[in-house]
Amino acid sequence: MLRFRNILAAVSAVLLLGLASSYMPIATAGDLPTEKGCKTLKEADSVMKGWCAAITRRKGNCLSCHHAIVDNWPETLPPGGNIGPPFVAMGARFPNSEDLRAQIWDATAKNPNSSMPPFGKHKLISEKDIDNIVAWLSTL
């Protein structure tokens, strides 16, 4: 029985180390701008534009309801919300980016009781902003 416990402990330790080493942040120090910093970005890829749309109050403002786990969260940015589900393992949860896009475009299509506004259906944000938010979320 003791041998079994030792083997179990060793296997558990290896699995935990494997999980810990597989964590990869989406950005490095200084890469994630604040809302003010987003306004001054000259060249940004769709992922960075998606981050900016997600934190900008006049655009998606996704992080007012959702929490995202990212490294180097800007100090002046309030923590994410807890109304909607957290942005964790988004690529695994939505392997088809069109499903994620449809959820942002109109969450009430799948769940009429959803508290998430139908951003695309009501034209709250542009189609391009939705595409950029999907690009950013797919990195999480």
Question: Where are the language model's segments positioned?
Answer:
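N-terminal export/targeting leaders of redox proteins
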Residues: 1-37
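Electrostatic cytochrome c docking/interface patches
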Residues: 27-58
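Short sequence/structural segments immediately N-terminal
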Residues: 47, 57-59, 110-111, 140
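Short pre-active-site segment immediately N-terminal to redox-active cysteine/selenocysteine motifs
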Residues: 57-61, 69, 129
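Gly/Gly-Pro-rich "capping" loops immediately C-terminal to redox-active cysteine motifs
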Residues: 63-105
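Substrate-binding/catalytic groove segments of enzymes
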Residues: 74, 109-114
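C-terminal capping alpha-helices of c-type cytochrome domains
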Residues: 98, 102-111, 120-140
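Methionine-biased hydrophobic packing positions in alpha-helices, especially
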Residues: 116-118
